[in-house]
Curated annotation (Swiss-Prot):
Function field: Plays an essential role in the initiation and regulation of chromosomal replication. ATP-DnaA binds to the origin of replication (oriC) to initiate formation of the DNA replication initiation complex once per cell cycle. Binds the DnaA box (a 9 base pair repeat at the origin) and separates the double-stranded (ds)DNA. Forms a right-handed helical filament on oriC DNA; dsDNA binds to the exterior of the filament while single-stranded (ss)DNA is stabiized in the filament's interior.
Gene3D superfamilies: 1.10.1750.10, 1.10.8.60, 3.30.300.180, P-loop containing nucleotide triphosphate hydrolases
The protein's assembly and partners: Oligomerizes as a right-handed, spiral filament on DNA at oriC.
Protein name: Chromosomal replication initiator protein DnaA
Gene name tied to this protein: dnaA
Record-level GO BP terms: DNA replication initiation; regulation of DNA replication
Species this protein is from: Gloeothece citriformis (strain PCC 7424)
Coiled coil segments of this chain: none
Chain segments carrying region Domain I, interacts with DnaA modulators: 1-73
Amino acid sequence: MELSPQDLWTQVLERLQSRLPRPAFDTWIGTAKIEQLTPQYLVICAANPFILNHLQKNYLQIIADVVEEILGYSIDIQLTSTQGENIAIVGETQVSAYYPTLSGEHPKPIKLNPKYTFSRFVVGSNNRLAHAATLAVAESPGREFNPLFLCGGVGLGKTHLMQAIAHYRLQMYPDSKVFYVSTEQFTNDLITAIRQDSLQSFREHYRTADILLVDDIQFIEGKEYTQEEFFHTFNTLHEAGKQVVIASDRPPKQIPTLEDRLISRFSMGLIADIQVPDLETRMAILQKKAEYENMRLPREVIEYIATHYTSNIRELEGALIRAITYISISGLSMTVENLAPVLNPPVERGEVTPELILNIIAETYKVSVEDLKGNSRRREISLARQIGMYLMRQHTDLSLPRIGEEFGGKDHTTVMYSYDKINQLQKKDLDLSQTLSQLSDRIHLASRTQKTT
């Protein structure tokens, strides 16, 4: 019996779904449609030229194999996209291998969040390119996007995608040398190597990676020796065809004091920007998060949270956790009326000034503004000063040197160190994370009050 084009494609999808990892199937295969079937060839339509190109390089062989299994004979495969680009594939000689083989003996990466996988990442219009690019890198490192530079604000999913690459690659190839490090860790390793006279060991460690994932690269600004060492590490890996993925809160050209040669290297691949998620994506994120927490949320609650928490995913998920915790403790039903008081959605924000932050920090930690601007190393003053620098960088557009000036003329490297330290601590210390959230709320409330007076 002769198959219709749609019947053939349905069978192709069923077989591919059982053979491919779910993220790969959903991103590359599931979005494609069959356009034409003749006795000589099959035309497949991809959603856009980006997906078309990846299908051509990585999936035509397996599609051709499945089509031949179903039909009992081979036919040519042609690709087209909804935007009019076409690639003709005649036979199997032009089809790329499905997965390249990597070998290695290095230990697996450490400190990966088990939740940061592709299957738990919610794709929306704000992050579709970044998601597709990271998945492409995970499947075929060193081929299409090298380096891959992810940029976007705090809490938008850059770290999630970077660690998803590591999880995916290690699941497929457990012996792969995949290194995930923060810029702070790279710098600390370099400092330790210098102190212990073991620079060669440091270089051999990083320069034998198959995939190097470096988070928060913006903190390399002002660190001249770290930039020098990273430049040579980057070159060694890139020339060997190894994959480098970098994440930052801003594009390369906007990182202060970053050397031109690094800006050039970081810009030579793909720069994928991650934007703030739209309402539909925020609702999907909340729904998925609730499912993982085994909670059923009414649609009106999801819509309420998604409507009022718009800045980033971290803020959004934090609101959901507060809601679930409150309902669990109080025993109340999950309604907007019951949750509205505890959620306290953020309001319109006014201008946040350095003076505002200094005064709030001084009041909270019972120190004076002069203490914050001074050089005292007393633990309580030093911590308050570091938190103040962290919050000033988070909530203002001031440069590092300008923030240093607001704290009594501190060097920009001191500001960088303080930001790095608090940023790392808050990821491990729940109390500190909550304190920072509360301080941020106070800053925004005060700025709004200041705006209306």
